[in-house]
Amino acid sequence: MKITEGYMPFKGFKTYYRIVGENTEGKKPLVLLHGGPGSTHNYFEVLDKIAESGRQVIMYDQIGCGNSFVEGHPELFNADTWIEELIELRKHLGLDEIHLLGQSWGGMQAIWYAIEYKPKGIKSYILSSTLSSAKLWEKEQKRRISYMSEVDQKALLDAVNTGDYSSKEYNDALERFMEMYCAGEVTEDSPECLRRPKKSGSEAYIVGWGQNEFSPTGTLSGYEFTDRLHEIKEPCLVTSGAIDLCSPYIAKTMYDRIPNSKWELFEYSRHMPFVEENEKYIKVLTEWLNAND
């Protein structure tokens, strides 16, 4: 399968992109927006198989992480920059008509783009384990924390209240929380793209979102689009896991308000159903894309 890699100049830096497969008439490319901010494209390589059906799959490292790593420029890490980067990448690669999949932060970006920019040429959106409200996300994560041991609850909430995230108790509790709702430990049996070392954008995450999933304090903390979801007119597939950071309540909040939407709940998944239920996810996604070309 053909894989093309390259860089696009952006704001004096460079944005890395990776294109899998070749264009086939009648099948619009699938563009992938990774999470974080700062998580890199790597985990999306488990979706390369989609290109075998003749559909080009395009992923990239957003500025601040991976092969587009930048640090010491906190002024970059906001929605305007990341959406401008997407707009420029579409121009650079001639992506007039696409399907757009955003996972976690990438889904926030897709919603923001859809509602505030009203872009042309989007055949469908796939909102994967994402959110329409930072406040609701915070509330749901804190609800989840209430089910943890009293020791872990105290460690997590003390850190939030004091602003001191350095204690061993906090970091151990955070690790348990993320393993429960985000992803398990990477092992020798994990896909190669997950085992590969990556340059995460920790500054992008902290400046953009905050110190952890339940403390949105960064440039994205005012993200609130629930009451405007009805403005998304394109077909929209919401996907989430049963024990996802994107709780079923968060997913249903989006599904209920987007007019032309479908929701697929993955029973055995946390925050990355495309990894934990890979075959099913690819089947569901491929059927969706084929139906909405």
From Swiss-Prot:
The keyword Protease applies. It catalyses: Release of N-terminal proline from a peptide. Residues 28-277 form the AB hydrolase-1 domain. The active site is at S104, D244, H271. InterPro entries: AB_hydrolase_1 (IPR000073), AB_hydrolase_fold (IPR029058), AB_hydrolase_sf (IPR050266), Peptidase_S33 (IPR002410), Pro_imino_pep (IPR005945). GO terms for cellular component: membrane. Pfam families: Abhydrolase_1. One of its GO terms (biological process) is proteolysis. Keywords: Aminopeptidase, Hydrolase, Protease. It is an enzyme of class 3 (hydrolase). GO terms for molecular function: aminopeptidase activity. The keyword NAD does not apply. Its EC number is 3.4.11.5. Releases the N-terminal proline from various substrates. Belongs to the peptidase S33 family. This is Proline iminopeptidase. It comes from Clostridioides difficile (strain 630).
